[in-house]
């Protein structure tokens, strides 16, 4: 005993720092999300992750190494069992692969969660739904949970039965998934199936009904333009989905004293619901609202808690995909013309905006110090009357163009006004405006995200065209950490990163 104690005392501080640190459930959510983005992070990325989740860099490195090893082992096991599968199931799509399947460790299974075990035998779908709705108000049931779904959601109503018939994928090396850059050229789901974008959701609250991780996931499916919640209770799986066009408002709010934040959604219609029972694996059957008191059908506001920075980045990726899908064919000249049209920046209250014509709805997203507004080209009878814009100061002489889209945002009232577009060609335009707020830090996409992967639009626009009227170009250039040639890069596919190069942040004092 004395020898052991003596040996332990000879450890250096560096050796003690290198000891493995057990991750809690909250840290694991962030680690899994980062693993989906990149399975082999470099030293800078590991340092960023360790600072974000308060773990040592060595512990982060070990977690990634172990996860890659488990994934390769699972892949070898899958290959050895391929002969046992029917020919129709031999090809596996990207959506069939779960990082959580191969990375789930005792850290999650033994995480401190109050568990209520239910041993009730449920003989019918109706009984399961009743049992599920009542159970969700308490605490989640401790089960092994697969965050990624076997099939992407369908865009049609869930009143019918769906089976596992997702398109086959040619990807067999799952270790490369973290390095994949989605093909963002305009296409249809029949040509390519993009992987879903997952939001690290620790809890979901709708009215008084609450669901907790790890029996919960939220993802955006680009192929169907659908948001989908996936939940489990014992061996029964539940889905709640709605089209992205059903979202009236979506924004990320954060506590300045905490790393956690909330993704807030407001819907204009109730979601559709489906269930998959153990007796019919792979078959999703439409069902009634399984939430307690059917609150998911009656309450339109959803609150999803999770790491604020990651929620913010994932929301920007969703906007990027949708923006590029709609506006991929817009010419550089059209974008430059719209940027140059000048009442877009009209007063000190105007935040940087992203204006994208998509479907017939309006989405406004507060993300960090940015406000992203996605508005549709509505008929005149549905248009909001524009409010008068204050006259700009002498430093910025701008004149309204006939085809400009004016976005005036009142941060307190959260209202976005726009004028009717007289030029139909301007309907499919994207304007990316840099927002510079005194005394604030504007986060952008992580430093591993290269703009060249997602767009070939690299026109540089004068800083003077993008500034609020109370800031001069000289003030910005002298007070910012980094601006490429005093210019911003037009990049409609990355709403949160309209700057040249790969930046961690841009500060203005």
From Swiss-Prot:
Query: Where does the protein end up?
Result: Nucleus
Residue ranges the record marks as coiled coil: none
| Chain residues forming the annotated DNA-binding region | 16-75
Q: Name one GO cellular component term.
A: nucleus
Segments carrying the region annotation (Disordered) are 1-26
Predominant location: nucleus
Q: Molecular function (GO) terms listed? A: DNA-binding transcription factor activity, RNA polymerase II-specific; RNA polymerase II cis-regulatory region sequence-specific DNA binding
Q: Any idea what this protein is called? A: Homeobox protein HOY1
Species lineage, top-down? Eukaryota, Fungi, Dikarya, Ascomycota, Saccharomycotina
Q: Which gene encodes it?
A: HOY1
């Amino acid at each position: 005993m004395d020898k052991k104690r003596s040996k332990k005392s000879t450890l250096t501080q560096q050796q003690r720092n290198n000891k493995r640190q057990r991750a809690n459930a909250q840290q694991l959510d962030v680690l899994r999300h980062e693993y989906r983005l990149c399975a082999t992070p470099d030293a800078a990325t590991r340092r960023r992750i360790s600072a974000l989740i308060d773990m040592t860099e060595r512990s982060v490195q070990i977690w990634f190494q172990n996860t890659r090893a488990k994934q390769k082992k699972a892949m070898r096991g899958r290959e050895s069992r391929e002969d046992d599968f029917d020919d129709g199931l031999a090809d596996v799509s990207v959506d069939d692969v779960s990082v959580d399947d191969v990375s789930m460790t005792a850290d999650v299974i033994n995480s401190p969660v109050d568990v209520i075990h239910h041993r009730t035998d449920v003989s019918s779908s109706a009984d399961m739904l009743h049992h599920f709705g009542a159970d969700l108000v308490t605490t989640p049931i401790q089960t092994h949970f697969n965050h990624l779904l076997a099939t992407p959601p369908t865009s049609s109503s869930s009143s019918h039965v769906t089976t596992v018939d997702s398109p086959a994928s040619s990807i067999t090396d799952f270790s490369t998934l973290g390095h994949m850059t989605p093909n963002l050229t305009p296409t249809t789901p029949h040509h390519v199936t993009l992987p879903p974008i997952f939001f690290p959701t620790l809890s979901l609250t709708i009215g008084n009904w609450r669901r907790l991780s790890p029996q919960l996931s939220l993802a955006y499916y680009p192929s169907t333009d659908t948001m989908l919640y996936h939940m489990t209770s014992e061996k029964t799986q539940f889905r709640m989905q709605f089209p992205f066009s059903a979202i009236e408002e979506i924004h990320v709010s954060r506590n300045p004293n905490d790393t956690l934040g909330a993704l807030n959604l407001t819907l204009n219609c109730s979601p559709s619901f489906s269930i998959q029972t153990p007796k019919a694996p792979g078959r999703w059957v439409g069902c009634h609202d399984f939430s307690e008191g059917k609150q998911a059908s009656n309450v339109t506001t959803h609150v999803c808690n999770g790491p604020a920075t990651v929620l913010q980045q994932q929301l920007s990726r969703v906007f990027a995909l949708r923006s590029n899908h709609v506006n991929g064919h817009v010419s550089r000249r059209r974008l430059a013309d719209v940027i140059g049209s000048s009442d877009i920046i009209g007063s000190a209250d105007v935040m940087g905006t992203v204006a994208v014509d998509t479907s017939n709805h309006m989405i406004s997203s507060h993300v960090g110090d940015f406000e992203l507004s996605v508005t549709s080209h509505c008929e005149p009878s549905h248009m909001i009357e524009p409010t008068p814009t204050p006259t700009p100061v002498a430093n910025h002489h701008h004149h309204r163009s006939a085809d400009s889209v004016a976005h005036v945002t009142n941060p307190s009232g959260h209202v976005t006004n726009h004028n009717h577009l007289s030029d139909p060609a301007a309907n499919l335009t994207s304007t990316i405006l840099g927002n510079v707020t005194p005394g604030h830090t504007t986060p952008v996409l992580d430093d591993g995200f290269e703009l060249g992967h997602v767009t070939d639009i690299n026109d540089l626009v004068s800083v003077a065209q993008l500034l609020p009227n109370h800031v001069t170009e000289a003030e910005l250039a002298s007070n910012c950490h980094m601006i490429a040639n005093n210019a911003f890069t037009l990049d409609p596919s990355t709403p949160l990163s309209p700057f040249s190069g790969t930046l961690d942040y841009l500060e203005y004092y």
